[in-house]
């Protein structure tokens, strides 16, 4: 078979195709899509005949499903005089083929091993490499023919199984879809073309191949010419037409070389189709040239994105591998050091977590939660103070009526003052305990998340850490609650430094006076409406009872402000100290204590089977991606 690629492409073809073949052989296609040409067609479309004509070897033929696994057909053109060479690879095995006539049986044997004897299909790839002076530099992926109806022995959904397999390949944007259609059927009704149009509606990566031109009904030849001229169903890459060996010629043992000569004569002499030959749209050699050029151009176009994808996948894989950790070493001494390092790193991160420092194991920030919740606590205390200020006038008046004894008007009842203050402070106790429990749980979750990040893949070590975290949480929460309740008991002792109280009282009086003056101005502005202008202060001061109440309210507001601000700070300090800092310190002590228990070391280092398998898979993936990256750099 003669090929007329110009020297420019001759120099680019083999290296480009070899690069993609090498990447595919590495298994990179598991990680990203590679440029490829996938061959699809309905059953009996002549697909196998086209591939036979291109490769020069007989492929499995017959009725029903013949191609039962994706077949990667790698053709490498050799110099004239060099010997034919073949090799088949599948399921991590490789076998040399000495004789071209053995290819068909080798493929059948591989399919039986992979898809089972009979009519089942498999997604696993068979790779067939052929080196010969009579083949083009080209790699194709042959896919099973599309079956419309299940035959004896086939699953009822065989058609859907095949379509699913085909879609797996043709959906990828990196794949050129080679659609094989017989000339003697309505092209618009073929399943293969419909599937190609579903994934490539604009026809940008679809190439049509018409077969069996000798079976065209008389009078419809011009329709075939119109199809090839892209005037019926448009495809950007256009159409080619070929005539391969028919069953009669195969029975007569017509060689592929002779079949190529007969094909050439058929088109040259055909009354209608000769124009397609003259235009370069016909014969297997012209198809081979077009496919080679299309593939090389496609590879060149895909190369920049391919490099980007490999670099992205490398970064993703390294990150995933880092999360999996390195795994424990085999040497007993090294295993102990490994465990010490792992536990020490965890406990140091626990301390850093409690102090708001940066962590080595992931991004966990419990302080943002604490800051938000402490802010809510302060806002709650402030609201409580405002509500208290609004209701104390009524409470003081009611209390005076019920409990004032022999005192003369104008004397402040200190007992009334104490009772009201204590009652108001007591109302903050349960909300404070509730806040403690919320933040204790937040701290527990943060420490558990840290343990999960630190001990990924070591379930027993993680369980040990979690158990200790849960126990410490209960202990520290209980201690913190007791401390808070003690704090509130102390707050029931009405006390503050005289200077502090005097300062607060003066400030409160000044605020009240400013408020009254504001009310006075407001009332003066309203006097033109006939409203009486009365000084609030004179009204209150005019009555001894009111003077007493006013004085009492000033004292209550002043003291409550001091006590509430004390609690606004003290509650967060207790929580932060006990359920965070002390929590972390005790966790550090207890985890380091486990290192003293030498008998438990092997148990603690038992690794999760899934993590071990995942690490091995990621290491394998990293290895092939690095090789792929090197291939691209050297290309």
UniProtKB/Swiss-Prot annotation:
Region (G2 motif): 66-68
InterPro entries tied to this protein: Dynamin, Dynamin_GTPase, Dynamin_GTPase_CS, Dynamin_N, Dynamin_stalk, G_DYNAMIN_dom, GED, GED_dom
Annotated region (G1 motif), positions in chain: 41-48
Cellular compartments per GO CC: cytosol; microtubule; nucleus; plasma membrane; presynapse
Residue ranges annotated for the Dynamin-type G domain, each copy included: 31-304
Compartment(s) where it occurs, according to its Swiss-Prot or TrEMBL record: Nucleus; Cytoplasm
Pfam families noted in UniProt: Dynamin_M, Dynamin_N, GED
Induction and repression of expression: By polyinosinic-polycytidylic acid (poly I:C) and viral haemorrhagic septicaemia virus (VHSV) strain 07.71 in muscle, head kidney, spleen and liver.
Annotated spans, G5 motif: 243-246
Chain positions recorded as GTP binding sites: 41-48, 142-146, 211-214
Keywords: Cytoplasm, GTP-binding, Nucleotide-binding, Nucleus
Stated role: Does not inhibit strain RB-1 of the fish pathogen, infectious hematopoietic necrosis virus (IHNV).
Family per record: Belongs to the TRAFAC class dynamin-like GTPase superfamily. Dynamin/Fzo/YdjA family.
Stated name of the protein: Interferon-induced GTP-binding protein Mx2
Primary gene name: mx2
